[in-house]
């Protein structure tokens, strides 16, 4: 039995001699009991702990549902009927290209700057400053609310047509009921939103497959669906606009199909790894959406007549194999797109309120639950969406959404352009007019380390060593004071000796006189980060004074050599000729080596910003002017109520100054840059002694001292006359 007891002890206690692989006898039973389901009354329906998502279950799904929206199901046939197949594919590609440039610009901003959880607002605010970021953020929230109203209205129109109810108030009633239901899901938490989106995404895929299969399995000539025909495709290839329509009006109606590309940025606070999840998920969603759009345009142009494409908005339902599945996809896309807007807009509004960009909205910054669900912001955005529901027409709301989002995308594109130009200005080799100049900063040594040569002024360390030779320190007093301190610590308060001027100079300049000249550059390093040294000095003095019963306000000088050692440069600082700089609040970083970072180009972003502004005015110049006017008013208001907002990471880059400099360069040859020699705040003043006579027998009898004599004014004048 004596041999069995140790083994039994091992099995019961789970370990012996540090072994961690041995389990308890009843480990399996305990594990099974932990995995058993709880009673139904203890199940938590709502989210009580933070939930984070990844690339495919979070970003890709949300972007696809928002991009693959009601515009695709209701307006693709109308687009083909006006622009034709060829120009329709060009228009779809152009819409996706504008969205792609904006996504790449957003990825570039996230790569270069640290972005918070505010999505579009955080990107613009970090780069262009709080005033511009707050202005664009408010306009983006407004656009999301209008887009949500448009999606709900499209859903209500389809339901009313299905029920043969053409009353406008029926459409509005259905829209309000749906909006209230979506607000309830949003309040339940982000976990339920993502779960519902996964189900909706699956149903969307089924409805799309139903449309593709139905295009070659049956015909419906009475409703314009005549099947594949080469002649029909030739007739539908080129544009033939209805009266009052043009390429840009069609673009304005169809562009909201791509407004969901920024959803991934808006949910950055709920992602596991935003720096990886957002780029991969957004780019994958854009590529998939472009392919499906092109398939829809080509199929509708090859199987349907132009007249029905123009005037029958539900032509895609006639093509589908099972019309109910297509309607299900339409309903789901409408609800999902609206839910995406109701998810992103309140969180951006919450971020703006938390940063107190607009002090009047600070009460909206509160959140409920572990994911900080913005309850108050959800209600505000819901009311704003409800107000636009009463307009009740998709073709009226679509241009408003387009122009608002074009302004937002232009701001994102310009943000990446400006932050890249600012980064290049900071790292330009021709800065200060010299190709190899080094910029002095408060965290770099004011005295650059060079070897001592003939004619040099020396260093502060050498100057202090000369002071040692002039004022001999009394080395015999230190042991006595130390011993007296050890004998009676209480008397140290009253018998504290005052240090000579030489030692105070040593403490001020952090010089170590115990190191020999063989240390070279290490002994000459002067750390000039005064803020850190002062904080260290005060902490060291207060700590020592508390330990020894001394009032810290009684003296500002260090009490012993240990205090001087605290101020000495660290080994990391002495090992290099330059001191590592502090990371500023808005540090612009270099692009990573990822594959998507290679496609981020600031010139393309700049062209995208200009193109977005031009498209705004071409689509509807009145709406464009109204948006710009509201943006200017918001900018001035935010600057007035909160003038102390951050200037942004690209504050040193001025667009107008860059334009003026470019104009001067084009008009005439650039003038040679002026070079300014700026002396540092602490000059490298020092003294150096040199022995002019050699050590040999010829001069052995000569005294080792210098002679001096007084010369009167008359003798001085006579000597040089």
Swiss-Prot record:
Keywords, comma-separated and alphabetical: Chloride, Ion transport, Membrane, Potassium, Potassium transport, Symport, Transmembrane, Transmembrane helix, Transport
Region span, Disordered: 473-505, 533-580
GO biological process, one term: chloride ion homeostasis
Acyltransferase among keywords: no
Chief location of this protein within or outside the cell: membrane
Domain of life: Eukaryota
Topology relative to the membrane: Multi-pass membrane protein
Residue spans of biased composition, Acidic residues class: 553-565
Gene Ontology cellular component terms for the protein in this record: membrane
Transmembrane segments: 53-73, 84-104, 115-135, 136-156, 174-194, 196-216, 247-267, 283-303, 321-341, 374-394, 397-417, 606-626, 628-648
Pfam families, per database record: AA_permease
GO terms assigned for molecular function: potassium:chloride symporter activity
Location(s), subcellular: Membrane
Family: Belongs to the SLC12A transporter family.
Described purpose of this protein according to its UniProt entry: Cation/chloride cotransporter.
Name of this protein: Solute carrier family 12 member 8
Phylogenetic lineage: Eukaryota, Metazoa, Chordata, Craniata, Vertebrata
